[in-house]
Design a protein with these regions (language model features):
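Conserved phosphate/oxyanion-binding catalytic-loop motifs
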Residues: 48
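Conserved nucleotide-binding/hydrolysis micro-motifs of P-loop NTPases
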Residues: 51
Length: 258
């Protein structure tokens, strides 16, 4: 297997690829430091919605990697740009309050907002909270979900993520939430445009078949599934075949550059 000269840029997932529940995956940080050293283009493409980009950058710094905040693409930033473009400045924001810093240009309004935005509330997703979001959404112009991941990893085990709660709201409202993060084409296209390369020259590296691999394939990107994070836990997705399967992120070094 060789990727030499075929790949000119990387899109890299974070959770399950670079780190797992706050602990770095062996070899990942040194691999990205090598990318920095040789000026190889890459972006982090993450569905993390529990913290703003500056906190993600600080998290990476604590793991030994100093990175430019503009290399981190999140659904929060995608949502912010979408809202501004469509002139929706009054919003009901249901997410971790740490993320409010990315929405300082907006008025938080839970009574009659232009848009309702739903992110990962983790254990705060109660019946009361879902019903509150449902009622707020009834008269909103736009319904936005940071992502619709079915599952994530909590305390070392696979667990429900944001997606099932969004689906419940969609069913009750008989209306769809606009997806901001992976696997939406909108999100991947924004990353491709940022990099400026042909789609066939970009490789998406992730641990989630449905969100990372299928999402990238829908935009005709090359894909690499790593055997860390969620790998092996999505047995119901056998039909999704990545371009490459590797043990971990750092395994790319010998294939790409040697």
């Amino acid at each position: 297997m060789t990727l030499k000269r075929k790949i000119k840029a990387l899109l890299i997932d974070l959770e399950g690829v670079v780190y797992q529940e706050g602990k770095k995956i062996p070899g990942s940080i040194s691999f990205i430091q090598y990318l920095e050293k040789i000026n190889f283009p890459y972006l982090f493409l993450t569905n993390t919605t529990t913290m703003p980009r500056k906190d993600i950058a600080n998290k990476l710094l604590k793991l030994g990697l100093k990175t430019n905040i503009n290399k981190i693409i999140t659904p929060l930033i995608a949502a912010k740009n979408y809202l501004k473009k469509n002139h929706h400045f009054s919003i009901a924001l249901y997410c971790n309050k740490r993320c409010y810093v990315d929405f300082q240009d907006f008025q938080i309004n839970f009574q009659s907002p232009d848009a309702v935005i739903v992110g990962d509330l983790y254990k705060k997703f109660s019946w009361e909270k879902l019903n509150e979001i449902f009622l707020t959404s009834l008269n909103s112009k736009k319904l936005i979900a940071f992502h619709k991941n079915k599952t994530g990893t909590r305390k070392g085990s696979i667990a429900l993520d944001l997606g099932p709660f969004v689906k419940a709201l969609e069913y009750a409202l008989d209306n769809d939430f606009i997806l901001m993060g992976k696997p939406s084409k909108f999100f991947f296209q924004a990353a491709v445009d940022h990099l400026g390369f042909n789609k066939k020259e970009i490789l998406m590296v992730g641990d989630d078949k449905e969100v990372d691999i299928r999402g990238a394939q829908n935009l005709h990107l090359q894909t690499c599934l790593v055997k860390t994070g969620k790998y092996g836990k999505q047995i119901y997705l056998k039909s999704i075949e990545p371009s490459y399967i590797l043990p971990k992120l750092s395994s790319l070094k010998s294939i790409l550059f040697q």
